[in-house]
Amino acid sequence: MTDVTIKTLAAERQTSVERLVQQFADAGIRKSADDSVSAQEKQTLIDHLNQKNSGPDKLTLQRKTRSTLNIPGTGGKSKSVQIEVRKKRTFVKRDPQEAERLAAEEQAQREAEEQARREAEESAKREAQQKAEREAAEQAKREAAEQAKREAAEKDKVSNQQDDMTKNAQAEKARREQEAAELKRKAEEEARRKLEEEARRVAEEARRMAEENKWTDNAEPTEDSSDYHVTTSQHARQAEDESDREVEGGRGRGRNAKAARPKKGNKHAESKADREEARAAVRGGKGGKRKGSSLQQGFQKPAQAVNRDVVIGETITVGELANKMAVKGSQVIKAMMKLGAMATINQVIDQETAQLVAEEMGHKVILRRENELEEAVMSDRDTGAAAEPRAPVVTIMGHVDHGKTSLLDYIRSTKVASGEAGGITQHIGAYHVETENGMITFLDTPGHAAFTSMRARGAQATDIVVLVVAADDGVMPQTIEAIQHAKAAQVPVVVAVNKIDKPEADPDRVKNELSQYGILPEEWGGESQFVHVSAKAGTGIDELLDAILLQAEVLELKAVRKGMASGAVIESFLDKGRGPVATVLVREGTLHKGDIVLCGFEYGRVRAMRNELGQEVLEAGPSIPVEILGLSGVPAAGDEVTVVRDEKKAREVALYRQGKFREVKLARQQKSKLENMFANMTEGEVHEVNIVLKADVQGSVEAISDSLLKLSTDEVKVKIIGSGVGGITETDATLAAASNAILVGFNVRADASARKVIEAESLDLRYYSVIYNLIDEVKAAMSGMLSPELKQQIIGLAEVRDVFKSPKFGAIAGCMVTEGVVKRHNPIRVLRDNVVIYEGELESLRRFKDDVNEVRNGMECGIGVKNYNDVRTGDVIEVFEIIEIQRTIA
């Protein structure tokens, strides 16, 4: 083929010269319009164009098939379901070179597999030949051994043949005798079964006839109705009575219904009709319905409600109560909901609630006291001695700074034996003094809370109250509180009018003020003695003591001196070196060192006793206060102290009290009333002030805890996370860090390890010695948690003079600011005829086409209200702001 030029080739292919030159360039051949093209170059261009325009290497075909499936539904209606099946297939175009390479690899793989197969066949043939040779040798050995065994067996068979014949003859004879006995027994059983079946059939027929006659005549059953028989045969009568008892027993006992059913394999016991009648009488048919019978009445007498005696302990779960009443737990829960209490099946309820529920459901309740062990321990005490006169126990109360402490100091310094070395070394909280007319025991600082709790627990620890009132100050709030405590305790009051030596003293005013609260002097016809004293000068102290002894003589105070002691805890605290220490006032008996005492939730052996001077004593009689050591823990102020015989029983009683206190507490906490349920649902978030409280004595802990808990409101609550007696330890600091609480120490300090934790965790630690300062600061902390009060304040008014349309904002109100200032980012209200018709915010605030943040009084502006286009001339736009006002707790 001759060479042609680019132009000629372009004319032949009917394309432009530039495109042809570009195609040659793409194929790697550089040509111009006048250059010639050889045949080799043409072939190169054709291959390049074929490769470029060869089409896609992959072809995907998709096919969808739709069909409808009818599914039968409920109510006889069918349901149509559309089903679509999608199929997808992909074809890949292989490269010729790739196809040749794959074919070569497949051929090589087939040859390798063929070679491996031939080698495997040859190896298998060799192994089979070797195995056949081994098996032939083993077979020859086995045949030789079997031949030897057969020969030996032949010899044994000949020798034992005669013995076997003898044994077979004997066995055949025994078998024949056994078969004969079995045939005889079966014949007897068949005859007896036929007789019983006939008797039962006759009895059943008689019973049916009797029932039919009874229901037809509608007659009342008589006493001899069970003795009615329809046959004269004695055996038939017995079978009839037995059948009646079985049927009636099956009706009366639902649990023994299985016993009344016919056995599965007993086909000859009764006929098919009889078996159906028995099944219908014992249990219901399919679906709970009884199978009808033409000869049996379907009426059944309703069961009478069973009233049971329900024994209820101090606590019981709902499930246990249901089991005692033999009802379902859901019925008990329903009854509790009717009474207004929500409960679950496993919830513990108290004795009163369980009693109400059981009586509501018609049962008789027997309340059981579970403290038999405690009563047994308390009754095992030798307290049968005669009562003797005892010293009075006096509590001195009064307002702050009225000279109460000075009066006590003067009495102690003058009446305590002066020969005591070191004087009063310890402040025990109670002490006794000797006078010419007798002994008096004073309670120093019981605190009002401890005083009230002792009276509430029935501990007759206080006999007389000395009310100290300053002659120059008169009756103060705490004086009134002391009078209320004395009246609640129903104890006589002796009034000591102190500071009588001051020039401004006015004892008559004190009498007049006290008379308003029911404290009348004897000269006015009352029962209270008034004594004028001066704690500073010592005036009237002897008269006060004589008045106390006179009042005690009127009361005729007596106590048993011999026997096992009992008393009350005046104060308790935890000493770092000695452990739990309790100040005990003995009420009766004599307390000895080494006695086993039971004190509330605690118990122990008295290891040491000390009097108010800090001296060791071996015994303490009635009205004597002592410190005792050796208890298992710190008891609560006001707890009863009792001496018992056995330490093991004392421990059991203490543990029982702890567990019972916990159960009763949980039962009362879990009790939720229906009327409170919706209130609890609607309550919002309640803030809590968590406090870990430590104080020097138990009385301070109780008083501070009660005062703080009374500060709680609906929005902020005070929560005492932990409290105790003694210094602040590392455990207290860790507890405060975990619960985000405030550490409060009242007359105590934190140790070194606790201070490290407090510094590391940045805890809030506060020390106090005055309870009023503590309460004020907790109030301030609670006030900070109150949500602020929101108040709306109007800051500007704008009157709409005209309304314009804007393509961007919609209706624009042309306004004149008449009052205050209009700010862009504040909420607004639209008023029409002084009625609010819209509340929202501004979208645009302009003045002379400029966006501004505020427009003041007397200036015009354009206002665009967001999401509101119904602004009219004459409307008023009110701009306001929301102010937060911090609230405080009163």
Swiss-Prot record:
Q: Where does GTP bind?
A: 398-405, 444-448, 498-501
PTM characteristics: A proteolyzed form, called IF2 gamma (begins with residue 290), can be detected during purification which has all the activities expected for this protein, although it is slightly less efficient than full-length protein. It is not clear if it exists in vivo.
Basic and acidic residues composition bias: residue spans: 92-217, 267-280
Start and end residues of each stretch annotated as G3: 444-447
List the lineage, top down.
Bacteria, Pseudomonadati, Pseudomonadota, Gammaproteobacteria, Enterobacterales
Q: Which organism is it from?
A: Escherichia coli (strain K12)
Where found, per UniProt? Cytoplasm
Which NCBIfam families does the UniProt entry name for this protein? IF-2, small_GTP
Q: Tell me the domain of life.
A: Bacteria
Q: What is this protein called?
A: Translation initiation factor IF-2
What PROSITE patterns has UniProt attached to this entry? Answer: G_TR_2 (PS51722), IF2 (PS01176)
